């Protein structure tokens, strides 16, 4: 089975995630758009990435940042037109970059034509495209709650029925039990494949097989049957990359999702490592120090268990997560060193690495002085709730600085010009004030920058197959500072070794490997033998 997998282009690929709203504005309205991305393709080619994962750009009322789609076969005017999208796919292809689309197949917007028809009458051909239950007003079918708070059922008086929504009331769940719904979805995906889409990231895909009467939302009984049919009818007709977003995935489920026989997805996003710095049993806002030993154990487990029978997605950042250099590095004194250290650890592992826009510049979290400067709905809701619960403003702002989603969404920092070169207008979200120091223009003029370090990591993955195929062995498992592992393929071994802290760390491995070839290193001059300096990281081959 391992053999069949090797031909897939995505095995040694590196993917760059763009949050279009914050990447590059081309028309001065303060919102990033598709033409802006086209203008920056040469920058991405220089970095060396193979594909762009585009956060949602389909037509949407934007109730949930585009994850509420009202037309799967059109582009939201905020980002441009269908012609712009076709041009982006074409221009990216000229540079050997594929475009991965973000699709939401669990639910649509309530403004989608299907739902507008569905609520006209119980006899409407589109009625069964959604999940309905008869009932009485005020007496819910059951006590299920939506992810965004409140009941998961919404009353439609004309029909005397409730519809089911796992997310907002404006995101009714699609009824995957209905073969007509599935056919519509497959036809839409084939249409995008025809237009040249290189792959798909599938939002909350583990929730499509819900059974609300049994209170089952994710991992429903027919989930793998549905995914395998989806794959057969669409993805397997082209050499695409497909990524399932599966918050509920454990190792065994991930093996099914990313089976090398290609029956489901290329890989999944799992989030076990991302939840390690919150207090047990509490919300993401209740921050706890990162247990480095636990982080090593979790990442090593996924490396070992999926080797040869599945495939990992490797990521520190996305549009919902705080900037990794602020989160688990040091974004002040050791910003450059810790940004490079975190990159070294991730890019040495087996799987497909994802770089989130600005990560390659070492962009940091933002600390706006006032809540009015924030735009993220989750952040604003939490602020209100916690004030009512008696938290102090300082405590709440501390949580927002650490975990708020706007940390990832401040505009891309292109230059030291006004608004960081992102827009000639007023940006939809303020630019991080540190753009005068941290920006692409200054990174590109400095050979020791974070940007060129990422470029080199990407090249190493292409040059040495050990990073793609090699076995993984964790070393110094209980050490609270040193994160070290070996990748081995045939006679080739690579040591990846890093100090995950701002104090020097003893590391005897260095003397054992002193005759090896240093592939990459985030310090310029040699230090004391057997000691790793703050956030020092390297890869050594022998």
What are these regions (language model features)?
Residues 1-542:
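Active-site and adjacent substrate-binding regions of carbohydrate-active enzymes
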């Amino acid at each position: 089975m391992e053999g069949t997998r090797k031909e897939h282009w995505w095995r040694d690929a590196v993917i760059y995630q763009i949050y279009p709203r914050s990447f590059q504005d081309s028309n001065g309205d303060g919102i990033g758009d598709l033409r802006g991305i086209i203008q920056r393709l040469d920058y991405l080619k220089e970095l060396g990435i193979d594909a762009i994962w585009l956060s949602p750009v389909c037509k949407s009322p934007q109730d949930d940042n585009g994850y509420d789609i009202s037309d799967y076969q059109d582009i939201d005017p905020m980002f441009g037109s269908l012609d712009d999208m076709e041009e982006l796919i074409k221009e990216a292809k000229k540079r050997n970059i594929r475009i991965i689309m973000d699709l939401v197949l669990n639910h649509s917007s309530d403004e989608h034509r299907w739902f507008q028809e569905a609520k006209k009458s119980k006899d409407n051909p589109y009625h069964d495209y959604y999940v309905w239950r008869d009932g009485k007003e005020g007496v819910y079918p059951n006590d299920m709650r939506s992810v965004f708070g409140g009941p998961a059922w919404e009353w439609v008086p004309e029909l005397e029925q409730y519809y089911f929504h796992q997310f907002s009331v404006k995101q009714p769940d699609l009824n995957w039990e209905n073969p007509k719904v599935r056919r519509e979805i497959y036809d839409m995906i084939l249409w995008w494949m025809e237009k040249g889409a290189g792959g798909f990231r599938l939002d909350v895909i583990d929730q499509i097989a819900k059974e609300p009467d049994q209170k089952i939302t994710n991992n429903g009984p027919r989930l793998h049957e549905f995914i395998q049919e989806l794959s057969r009818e669409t993805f397997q007709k082209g050499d695409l990359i497909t990524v399932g977003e599966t918050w509920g995935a454990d190792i065994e489920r991930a093996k099914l999702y990313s089976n090398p026989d290609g029956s489901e997805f290329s890989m999944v996003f799992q989030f076990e490592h991302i939840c390690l710095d919150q207090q047990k049993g509490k919300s993401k806002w209740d921050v706890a120090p990162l247990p480095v030993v636990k982080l090593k154990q979790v990442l090593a487990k996924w490396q070992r268990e999926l080797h040869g029978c599945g495939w990992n997605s490797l990521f520190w950042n996305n549009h919902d997560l705080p900037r990794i250099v602020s989160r688990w590095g040091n974004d002040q004194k050791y910003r450059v060193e810790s940004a490079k250290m975190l990159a070294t650890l991730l890019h040495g592992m087996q799987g497909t690495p994802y770089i989130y826009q600005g990560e390659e510049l070492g962009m940091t979290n933002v600390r706006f002085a006032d809540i009015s400067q924030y735009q993220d709905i989750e952040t604003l809701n939490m602020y209100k709730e916690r004030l009512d619960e008696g938290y102090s403003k300082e405590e709440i702002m501390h949580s927002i600085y650490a975990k708020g989603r706007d940390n990832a969404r401040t505009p891309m920092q292109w230059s030291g010009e006004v608004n960081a070169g992102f827009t000639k207008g007023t940006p939809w979200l303020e630019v991080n004030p540190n753009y005068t120091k941290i920006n692409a223009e200054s990174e590109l003029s400095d050979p020791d920058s974070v940007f060129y370090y990422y470029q080199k990591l990407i090249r190493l993955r292409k040059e040495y197959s050990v990073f793609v195929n090699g076995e993984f062995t964790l070393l110094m498992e209980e050490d609270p500072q040193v994160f070290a592992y070996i990748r081995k393929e045939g006679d080739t071994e690579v040591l990846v070794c890093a100090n995950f802290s701002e104090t020097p760390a003893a590391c005897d491995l260095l003397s054992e490997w002193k005759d090896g070839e240093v592939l990459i290193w985030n310090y310029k001059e040699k230090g004391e033998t057997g000691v790793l300096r703050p956030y020092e990281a390297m890869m050594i081959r022998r």
